[in-house]
């Protein structure tokens, strides 16, 4: 139940949903790349620090994974929590 609540909390914000949209469209991005895409594509007035806070909530819900590639931290969209949530309801 706790993870379900975390998923719903994470999805309850339009900026976090845009982040997931961008990661779904182009998986594996750095925070810098994600910030640039959100600012240019969606005309958001948002800082990297604000995006990092949104990412921490997405991470708590296990919707975003961060891995190291060289000196960069790369973000990916983990769709499993959403699949599990829907499967529980649809079974």
What kind of region is each of these model predictions?
Residues 2, 9-10, 14-47, 72-81:
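N-terminal helix-turn-helix DNA-binding core of bacterial DNA-binding proteins
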Residues 68-73, 86-89:
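Hydrophobic transmembrane alpha-helix bundles
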Residues 59-69, 76:
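Beta-hairpin "wing" of winged helix-turn-helix
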Residues 55-56:
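Short, hydrophobic-biased segments on the C-terminal half of alpha helices
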Residues 5-6, 61:
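A generic local structural motif
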Residues 27, 65, 89-90:
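Single-residue recognition of alpha-helix boundary sites
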Residues 78-91:
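Phospho-regulated, low-complexity intrinsically disordered regions of nuclear gene-regulatory
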């Amino acid at each position: 139940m706790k993870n379900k609540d975390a998923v719903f909390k994470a999805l309850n914000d339009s900026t976090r949903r845009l982040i997931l949209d961008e990661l779904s469209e182009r998986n594996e991005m750095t925070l810098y790349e994600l910030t640039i895409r959100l600012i240019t594509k969606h005309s958001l007035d948002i800082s990297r620090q604000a995006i990092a806070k949104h990412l921490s909530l997405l991470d708590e819900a296990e919707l975003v994974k961060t891995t190291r590639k060289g000196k960069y931290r790369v973000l990916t969209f983990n769709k499993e929590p959403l699949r599990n949530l829907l499967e529980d309801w649809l079974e």
